[in-house]
Design a protein with these regions (language model features):
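Phosphate-binding loop that captures ATP/GTP phosphates
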Residues: 2-61
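Well-ordered beta-strand positions
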Residues: 95, 118, 172-175
Length: 241
């Protein structure tokens, strides 16, 4: 809705995302998120130096693995380093979007879920998607993953999907992300950041639902800050008296 700054981070090394997001750009290995996650310590300057800014959307930056990198390119990623990466990125921009895989054994996914203020879960509305969720739900039972607060969307939804039945099994959908040929083409042809032009009203409504949730969280944070400032001011006045 506005042009506040954001960084999109994907740390799934089985499919390096920089050449998928930006196939027309030659991105050197030294721009890889692997360089950051394998560092001794992660700070804002290190993160800023490994962000690739989108030419079409200069307020959006991306971080991911570079072309040709694989699981043996770097030492095993540590959970704590992912948290450091997220915290450092959050100090640089207004929003950090963590693009997770469905693989919970990749430490980036559980660490991202733990650190996320708003978690969006996208499932295919079929038996495969539903059973994936049922299988992984026990892994997210710890309170730090705030499982019950996640938003769940039906992704790649098609007219023949049993949306109501699948939704009943998982407790309901927060919205639909319908399949669209144009969106699929954007993803497969390297134009992923152009896909917003082809979103139908149901897709857009789901995106707006996410934005509304973020706005509500921001308002709640501002209200809490104001209340804290008022309390501090009252305590100072009481001390003066």
């Amino acid at each position: 809705r506005d042009k506040r700054k954001a960084i999109i981070i994907n740390a799934e090394i089985s499919v390096p995302m920089l050449p998928v997001w930006l196939p027309e750009q030659i991105i050197q290995t030294n721009a890889s998120v692997g360089q950051v996650l394998s560092s001794v310590e992660i700070d804002t300057s290190l993160v800023a130096g490994h962000v690739t800014v989108l030419k079409s959307y200069p307020f959006i930056g991306v971080m991911g693995y570079s072309a040709g990198e694989n699981p043996l390119s770097y030492p095993e990623v540590k959970y704590a380093m992912v948290l450091q990466l997220v915290n450092a990125a959050a100090r640089l921009v207004d929003f950090v979007i963590l693009d997770c895989s469905s693989n919970m054994t990749n430490v980036f996914t559980p660490a991202a879920i733990e650190s996320g203020d708003l978690v969006i879960r996208i499932l295919t509305p079929d038996l495969k998607g539903v059973n994936y969720l049922k299988a992984h739900q026990p892994l997210l039972g710890d309170g730090r993953f705030h499982y019950d607060q996640h938003m769940t969307f039906a992704g790649m939804a098609r007219p023949f999907h049993a949306l109501d039945e699948m939704g009943h099994i998982i407790g309901g959908w927060d919205g639909l992300l319908p399949y669209g040929k144009e969106i699929d083409r954007c993803a497969t042809e390297g134009g992923m950041f152009q896909a917003i032009k082809y979103c139908n009203p149901k897709y857009t409504a789901s995106l707006n639902k996410v934005l509304d949730a973020l706005e509500q969280m921001e308002l709640a944070d501002h209200a809490a800050e104001d209340e804290g400032n008022e309390t501090e001011h009252f305590e100072e006045e009481t001390a003066d008296e």
